Amino acid sequence: MSGHNKWANIKHRKMAQDAKKSKIFTKIIRELMVAAREGGTDPNTNNALRAAIERAKAANMPKDTMEKAIKKGAGELEGQSFVEALYEVYAPGGVAMLIRALTDNKNRTAQEIRHLLSKHGGNMAESGSVAWMFERKGVITVPRSEISDMDEFQLLAIDAGAEDIQDEEDPVRIITAPEEASNVKNALEENGYTASYELTYIPKNTVSVSGNDAEKLLKLLNVLEDNDDVQEVYANFEMDDSEMEALMEKMQ
């Protein structure tokens, strides 16, 4: 059984290879702008900016494009102003969702999300009714092939500030408090590991979905991620691996 993390990995891998790459760039540019505006232009002291730069590099965004986005966010260049919005949602199968958007018009974005939810079996939740089901965390990933001694690796990560290590899949995931993510990543890199990280929301508990609910849920996730204003969708579901793969192939 796998959940939202596996879905996101599959989705991002396929998007990176197809015509939707320009959409990924648009989302990352907004992320860079907002992070620079809210926390400054130094990634060493701004974890959100550092995570956005990591994401930009992973998507092979040109350095010039990154730098322009950061300067726009800091006010050094003229550009649109985006604000963060977090929407709490109930999805098919009793799944809880957080939808994180960066938008220049909150009313438009809320209207578009409501429309998508109404078409795909979801609905907006009252403020506070879903957010408590998730925790803000840093997640660092390391290719499993680089880890020759898992015990030694785990000890290194824990000493650096890791809260949990999930080594059942590839890549290995290290969970940290948001403020510790950069320290843990640095410690791993200093010891020769290739580490990338993001700031995310992790569900405290999960709901198992299958059949019709599973198909409706993945369709909803797809259309939400295709919305220009939506940066990330976090959901608390578990699904059989083979069923998830089959449904995603069906939706291509």
From Swiss-Prot:
Keyword Cytoplasm: yes
Gene Ontology BP annotations: regulation of DNA-templated transcription
Source domain of life: Bacteria
Single GO molecular function: DNA binding
Keywords: Cytoplasm, DNA-binding, Transcription, Transcription regulation
One GO CC term, this protein: cytosol
Principal cellular location given in the protein's record: cytoplasm
Keyword presence, DNA-binding: yes
One Pfam family of this chain: TACO1_YebC_N
Compartments reported by the entry: Cytoplasm
Recorded family membership: Belongs to the TACO1 family.
Stated name of the protein: Probable transcriptional regulatory protein Kole_1935
Natural source organism: Kosmotoga olearia (strain ATCC BAA-1733 / DSM 21960 / TBF 19.5.1)
